[in-house]
Amino acid sequence: LFFKGEKKL
């Protein structure tokens, strides 16, 4: 699972 911050990247 990706973190909220990772989704932007």
UniProtKB/Swiss-Prot annotation:
GO terms for cellular component: extracellular region. Keywords: Secreted. The keyword Secreted applies. Its main location: secreted. Expressed by the skin glands. It is found in: Secreted. It comes from the Eukaryota. This is Skin secreted peptide P3-1.
